Each structure stands twice: as C-alpha cells, then as structure tokens.
C-alpha cells in the first residue's frame, strides 16, 4: 500500500460495524496507508457529531467524486442489490452483506460490472471459520456436504417475511433448515455467515450448502456458529469430516458479535493488499 500512496476508502453504512471501521480508519488509517474519503448512511443524522462534516457523503450516487479505491458496504443487502454494480464503476467493492449474492440477478450484475470496469468484488468472510480450508477442499473436488448452523437469542434476529411471523414455542427452536438461498431473503442480516460458506464452496453454492437458523433463549450474550462438512471416503469407507463451533460474544440483541468486528477489519486490510482482479473473491 505504501508504494502507491494512500488507499482511498469509502464506508457505506454507519451502524455498529460501520462505526467501528470509521473509528479505526481515522485513528490507524494514516500509518497503514489508508485514507477515509467518505462515509454514507441512509440516515445522515446518525453521523452528526462523530463523522467530520467533510467526510459525510449525502448522495451515494456521487461517490465517484471522492475518487475511492475501495468502497466498503456494511449497511444492508439492499445497497448491493441497488447500487453494487454502480459502485464497481468507480472502485473495488468489499461486500459486508454477502446474503445479497443469493439473488442470482445481483450476482450476475456484479460479475458483469466487475469484468467491464476491471474492479474486484471482495466478500468479507465475517464469522465463517475455516473459509480457506473449505475453499481448498471444494477446489480439489472433495467437498461432499456443508452445513452451517447459526444460533442466538431471538432478540438478535432481524427477520423478514414468513420468518418474521414465526413463533418460538420453546427455549430452543429451529426457525429454518434448508438451502441457504431460501434463507437469505428472509434473514438478510442473520445469514451472512452461511452466504460466505456458499461462496467458499461454489460446487455446492447457495442451493447445496444447508443453512440452519436457531432461536435459543439461553444464548443471551453470544452467537454460536457450527460448521459441519464431509469430504471424500477413505479406504475403510469412513468419510472425512470436520465440525467447528464458534462462540462469539455479543451484546444482548446485537446482530454483529464482537469477534466479527475484528475479523471484518482484517478483511478490509487484506483486500487492500490483494491485486484488483475482476471476479468475486472471499477475503
């Protein structure tokens, strides 16, 4: 990054994750070769008093005027649906809402824009543990199944459609179990780990990776993500298998766990060091 001057970064979204990224960019950016050039939020008033007025972008369509090298989306999948392709006209894009890519039209538009404007689409792996190992096993043709279970307190969910009306009859309730593609539209902010898994395993993709959403009233201060995969059979007929469990501390009712904030910052740093090549890349 130091060889080419500061890497100009814009942040779209100013919720908990966006606030953390902006704070770090302002405090640590200069020594890391990063320059924050704008912050946009759907409600501009939320930035008052914490984001310098010169950095507040009022109109997302005008982001090109700030000449960003990288635009970081940490708002909502709708931003990727509505503006992702346009952002790629001006800069590389780091997607913080990978559930948006479950929509095949959106994925196609991003790929086409990426190729046309020669900009990369980076996807933050977020709370997905072992993403690189999943990718390697899949690339080798050995991944047979992949299942991601996300469990937290009901207050930590932001559900839509039929899932929003679902009731938890007991202390632990499975709200959804099935292909990740079917979950993302109704849990856009609670399915990003599963979406990242689908992108890490393109042979299975959004239709083959299984997502499970669990409401558990005992999980008042954490999000729990279980990743289970199976691989090729050995000489005895037993299959290769991995099961990881990630317990991520979280404030009551929070959508984003504390460790995910740190992981996202590392993804931001990583994609600023990767070559800008067209396509969709986990980082």
Swiss-Prot record:
Gene3D superfamilies: Dihydrodipicolinate Reductase, domain 2, NAD(P)-binding Rossmann-like Domain. One of its GO terms (molecular function) is NADP binding. InterPro entries: Asp/hSer_DH_NAD-bd, Asp_DH, L-Asp_DH, NAD(P)-bd_dom_sf. Disulfide bonds: none annotated. The modification Phosphoserine is found at residues 20, 168. Keywords: Phosphoprotein. One of its GO terms (biological process) is NAD biosynthetic process. Belongs to the L-aspartate dehydrogenase family. This is Aspartate dehydrogenase domain-containing protein. The gene is ASPDH.
């Amino acid at each position: 990054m130091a060889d080419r001057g500061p890497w100009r970064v814009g942040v779209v979204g100013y919720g908990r994750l966006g606030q953390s990224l902006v704070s770090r960019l302002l405090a640590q950016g200069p020594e890391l070769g990063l320059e924050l050039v704008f912050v946009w939020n759907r409600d501009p008033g939320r930035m008052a008093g914490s984001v310098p007025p010169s950095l507040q972008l009022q109109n997302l369509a005008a982001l090109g005027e700030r000449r960003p090298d990288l635009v970081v989306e940490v708002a909502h999948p709708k931003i990727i649906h509505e503006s992702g392709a346009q952002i790629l006209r001006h800069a590389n894009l780091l997607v913080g809402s990978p559930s948006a890519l479950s929509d095949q039209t959106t994925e196609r538009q991003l790929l086409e824009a990426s190729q046309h404007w020669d900009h990369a689409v980076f996807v933050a792996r977020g709370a997905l543990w072992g993403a690189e190992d999943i990718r390697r096993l899949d690339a080798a043709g050995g991944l047979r199944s992949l299942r991601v279970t996300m469990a937290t307190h009901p207050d930590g969910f932001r559900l839509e459609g039929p899932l929003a009306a679902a009731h938890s009859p007991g202390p632990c309730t499975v709200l959804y179990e099935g292909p990740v593609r079917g979950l993302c539209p109704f849990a856009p902010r609670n399915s990003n780990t599963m979406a990242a898994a689908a992108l890490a395993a393109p042979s299975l993709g959004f239709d083959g990776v299984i997502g499970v959403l669990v409401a558990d009233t005992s999980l008042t201060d954490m999000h729990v993500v279980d990743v289970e995969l199976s691989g090729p059979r050995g000489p005895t007929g037993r299959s290769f298998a991995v099961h990881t469990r990630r317990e991520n501390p979280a404030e009551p009712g929070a959508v984003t766990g504390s460790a995910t904030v740190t992981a996202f910052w590392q993804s931001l740093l990583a994609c600023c060091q990767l070559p800008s090549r067209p396509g969709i890349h986990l980082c």
